Amino acid sequence: MKNVLTILSILVSIQLNAQTRIIVDVNGKGDYRTIQGAINSLPDSSATPRVIFIRKGVYGEKIYIEKPNIIFEGEDRKATIIIASIARDEWRCGHTDDWGVATMNVGTNDITLKNLTITNNFGFDFKEKTIYCASDTTANKERNLRKDGHQMALRTMNMATRLKAINCHFRAFGGDTVSPWEIYNGMWYFKDCIMEGGVDFYCPRGWAWAENCEFISHTGPAAIWHDGSGSKDSKTVLVNCKFKGFDGFMLGRYHREAQFYLINCEFAKNMKDTPIYRVQTTNTINWGERIYYYNCHREGGNDFAWYKNNLPADINAKDISVKWVFGEASVLSRLSTRSWMLSWTYDTSKPKVSPYTMIQS
């Protein structure tokens, strides 16, 4: 009897831990032709991750993700493309919030993106357009859509947190391409990604880590942005990242409380000699200017003085890790963050940071 119970226990454990895997193929050779169809087929919740494997192809659809614990894995980053054309200025004329403003709209926790290109192509395929907009402040209620207006490829809402993107390409011409927004519990992890767009095209709120990422600025007065107003500990950390763009592109700015750390980053030689700056608004900044650099350089040399090493005295570059970033955030969220407990080790013989390793805790 004891052996029977043991076997049953093992079988139940295997069943509970079995990972659901759905295949999406735009040509009809999978379980679903559309990504949204695959999402809709899943139960509303799950204790273990569900995998939606997306085969090569162009998926012309706007994605809404409201079910947690899903891994979206593309077959090939360059060939697995999710694309939609959305101008935020037009969307908000008929909607009271941003739900649906992006190519990928995330309203839940524990979402992982792998090997995908996610594009909002409104600005790339721009055609002049004037629309009627009931909420517009002009007398005739007409609004001219702009090529460089807000065009989100990724937008999180509804207090979503713990999103990871690995080897993904986020594309837009206009602003706010990558918008993970949740100031109190937001935890965002990006590795080996490419992000491109206009003003503030990488604009996390809360806690964010970006490693080995490339940022391409098409237009606008800043590439990166941060809102850390939910907690003094909030921060955006960029490690081993590269920045390039149009001649005279500017690195970053902020409107609210913010905290930036740039470690081992490389800037293109055509970047403007302008530090990350505060935009003057009526917002009160209580925690001061907190913009830190370590071992950052300009392509070809001739570095600008404003990004010289300036880490706080109590912080060593080798201690800056994923675990360091999300430590207090994990307490605030009151949720298990085992999969977030990652760190990298520092080899003093090399100028760069070694690949991260998982910490089992």
Segments from the language model and where they lie:
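Sequence-level preference for short, compositionally simple segments enriched
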Residues: T20-S361
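Bacterial Sec-dependent N-terminal signal peptides
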Residues: M1-T20
